[in-house]
């Protein structure tokens, strides 16, 4: 569980989740659209939407995370 | 990670590939002129050799080829990080 308490690992996990959710939504849209209004599972749909709409910023964040991972 | 340097390198490569693969075609790439349909229509079967068309082809290839494997790899890395840190 230590990824939840280390801020950088948490950030990395969230970034990877956003990326994979947007891939899943691009590939099989109904899988995530089904839970659009679900309280818990709706978060994945929201992350997919973030990954679609804000893709340049997500990509920039990925590159910055890679650089910081490389330097540490 | 077991192999110290290679584990970090793996993360770096994974993040960089993700950075290329998330760029959405119709919302972002087409607007800045790097979309695949925006490419000047090449003559039949002839490869263009400009840098821009190479970049367009690279982004398109990464997106079509690597998105589905990346789903699995991302989820594996997420589970690994959550369980073992």
From Swiss-Prot, chain A:
Its placement in the membrane is given as: Single-pass type I membrane protein
Which Pfam family is one of those matched by this entry? DUF1242
Q: What is its main location?
A: endoplasmic reticulum
Please summarize what the entry says happens upon disruption of the gene. Inviable.
Q: Which domain of life is it from?
A: Eukaryota
Transmembrane segments annotated in the record for this chain: 54-72
Alphabetical GO biological process terms: intracellular transport; protein secretion
Keyword terms = Endoplasmic reticulum, Golgi apparatus, Membrane, Signal, Transmembrane, Transmembrane helix
Where does the record place it? Endoplasmic reticulum membrane; Golgi apparatus membrane
One GO cellular component term: endoplasmic reticulum membrane
The secretion signal range is 1-26
Task: Give residue ranges on the Lumenal side.
Answer: 27-53
Q: Known InterPro entries for this protein?
A: KISH_domain, Ksh1
Family, per entry:
Belongs to the KISH family.
The entry's function note states: Involved in the early part of the secretory pathway.
Q: What else is known?
A: 'Kish' means small in Hungarian.
The protein here is known as Protein Kish
**What species does this protein belong to?**
Saccharomyces cerevisiae (strain ATCC 204508 / S288c) (Baker's yeast)
What does the record give as the organism's lineage? Eukaryota, Fungi, Dikarya, Ascomycota, Saccharomycotina
UniProtKB/Swiss-Prot annotation, chain B:
Gene that encodes the chain: YOS1
Q: How does it sit in the membrane?
A: Multi-pass membrane protein
Protein name per UniProt: Protein transport protein YOS1
UniProt lists the family membership as follows: Belongs to the YOS1 family.
GO cellular component terms, alphabetically, are: COPII-coated ER to Golgi transport vesicle; endoplasmic reticulum membrane; Golgi membrane
The biological process GO terms on file are:
endoplasmic reticulum to Golgi vesicle-mediated transport; protein transport
User: What keywords tag this UniProt record?
Assistant: Endoplasmic reticulum, ER-Golgi transport, Golgi apparatus, Membrane, Protein transport, Transmembrane, Transmembrane helix, Transport
What's the subunit arrangement here? Component of the YIP1-YIF1 complex, composed of at least YIF1, YIP1 and YOS1.
Compartmental location? Endoplasmic reticulum membrane; Golgi apparatus membrane
**Xref: PANTHER family:** IMMEDIATE EARLY RESPONSE 3-INTERACTING PROTEIN 1 (PTHR15858:SF0)
The record lists the membrane-crossing segments as 2-22, 65-85
Summarizing the function annotation, the protein's role is: Required for protein transport between endoplasmic reticulum and Golgi apparatus.
């Amino acid at each position: 569980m230590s990824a939840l308490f280390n801020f950088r690992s948490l950030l990395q996990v969230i970034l990877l989740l956003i990326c994979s959710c947007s891939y899943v939504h691009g590939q099989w849209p109904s899988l995530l659209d089904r839970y659009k209004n679900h309280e818990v599972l709706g978060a994945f749909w929201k992350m997919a939407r973030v990954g679609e709409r804000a893709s340049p910023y997500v990509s920039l964040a990925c590159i910055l995370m890679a650089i910081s991972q490389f330097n540490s | 990670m077991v192999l110290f340097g290679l584990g970090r390198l793996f993360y770096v490569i994974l993040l960089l590939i993700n950075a290329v693969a998330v760029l959405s075609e119709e919302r972002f790439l087409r607007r800045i002129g790097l979309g695949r349909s925006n490419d000047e229509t090449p003559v039949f079967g002839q490869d263009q050799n400009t840098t821009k068309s190479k970049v367009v082809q690279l982004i398109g290839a990464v997106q079509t080829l690597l998105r589905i494997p990346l789903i699995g790899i991302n989820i594996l890395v997420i589970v690994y990080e959550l369980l073992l840190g």
